[in-house]
Amino acid sequence: MEKIRLKLKAYDHRVLDRSVVAIVEAVKRSGSEIRGPIPLPTKNKRYTVLRSPHVNKDSREQFEIRVYSRLIDIISATPETVDSLMKLDLAPEVDVEVTSMETK
């Protein structure tokens, strides 16, 4: 039996949630057991930039990028499950990291 772990990341949580729903539906149609989606903590990156290129250090702008993450575990994955996941057309903004584990 094989266990597949999917870790999805995106800057927009709405696009991420749409992709998660598509993955969950595809896995359920193939008959595999699924755990998740588990929301992981949001990572915030803040950048402070001077507005002026020369003087006025007191005048600054702050920008923030948020990275949203979800975790999905597919228990007892079948070849049909893998085929349905490969055929999915997910949004290009979503980064998918796939890890395969062998279970006893």
Swiss-Prot record:
Keywords, ordered alphabetically: Ribonucleoprotein, Ribosomal protein
PROSITE patterns (UniProt xref): RIBOSOMAL_S10 (PS00361)
Organism superkingdom: Bacteria
Entry's Gene Ontology cellular component terms: ribonucleoprotein complex; ribosome
Coiled-coil region(s): none
SMART domains with a match to the protein in the record: Ribosomal_S10
GO biological process: translation
Keyword Ribosomal protein in annotation: yes
GO molecular function per UniProt: structural constituent of ribosome; tRNA binding
Ribonucleoprotein is among the record's keywords: yes
Family membership noted in the UniProt record: Belongs to the universal ribosomal protein uS10 family.
Subunit structure: Part of the 30S ribosomal subunit.
Function of the molecule: Involved in the binding of tRNA to the ribosomes.
Alphabetical list of PANTHER family matching this protein: 30S RIBOSOMAL PROTEIN S10 FAMILY MEMBER
Protein name: Small ribosomal subunit protein uS10
Organism: Helicobacter pylori (strain G27)
Classification of source organism: Bacteria, Pseudomonadati, Campylobacterota, Epsilonproteobacteria, Campylobacterales
